Amino acid sequence: MKPEIIIMLTNNDITVKNAEEVFESCKDLPAKKWGFKDVGLPKDEMIKLAAKMKEAGKETYIEVVTYTEEGCLEGAKLAYECGFDYLTGALPFDSVFEYAKEHNLKYSPFCGKVGGSPVELTGSIDEIVSSAKECIEKGADGVDLTAYRYADGDPIELTKAIVDAIG
């Protein structure tokens, strides 16, 4: 697996107000994956920015940080309505998987026990690896691993375990 970076135009789990300006100043960088959160910009600005990213040849990502099934499904609908390629975050509810599949959205849900804002990841490494495997078995295109906010152990050890388990 070749690691790739996703440039997220966010700060403290909120899209920065000048996200469009930041993107315009950096769009010629070789990074191909760009995104932002579902909070911080009005929907019309999200649509416009996602379109600009695609026009620049970028893959687009929206990360949804919510923990109810209703909120996660609303996030999936927002991802589709704004024209994103990928939905990341949200919890792996069956309804979100179904919506993503029906609307050709690639989906990488949170794995492990996540909560709070900013997000905190808790649980044992084995529990988080098991959760990641379950997400992939359900049809996820990847997982959203918030290793840098892992509260119960070594984030490097966790990341290595996830890569070993699901690639």
Language-model features: locations:
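Alpha/beta enzyme core
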Residues: 2-60, 65-167
